[in-house]
Design a protein with these regions (language model features):
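A compositional/biophysical signature of low hydrophobicity enriched in polar/charged and small residues
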Residues: 1-96
Length: 96
């Protein structure tokens, strides 16, 4: 399973309904799980992004989960593939 870091920012709609955000996060975790995505960590943050999520799953499953989340109109996301130190060692060995 691949690891992804997902940076989320509230839309105007999302911030108007911010009190519902914890319940929406619980619902997202359940929906993501049905798609084969495990939400490992979720943090509310202050700064450029409002929520940071660490998820594991196949790339297509992550994409499906984020597209489904986006259709609700409460947040916008940016995702990044993340590599563990061991995964990076394996990648770097291929450079030789």
């Amino acid at each position: 399973m691949a690891t992804y870091v997902i940076l989320s920012s509230f839309t105007d709609q999302g911030i108007r309904n911010v009190k519902d955000s914890p319940d929406r996060l619980i619902a997202f975790k359940a929906a993501a799980e049905k798609l084969g995505v495990a939400i490992k960590h979720a943090y509310y943050t202050v700064g450029a992004h409002d929520i940071v999520v660490v998820a594991e799953g196949a790339g297509e499953a992550i994409t499906a989960a984020l597209l489904k989340l986006g259709t609700l109109g409460n947040i916008r996301t940016t995702s990044m593939r993340a590599y563990s130190p061991d995964e990076m060692k394996g990648i770097l060995k291929k450079l030789a």
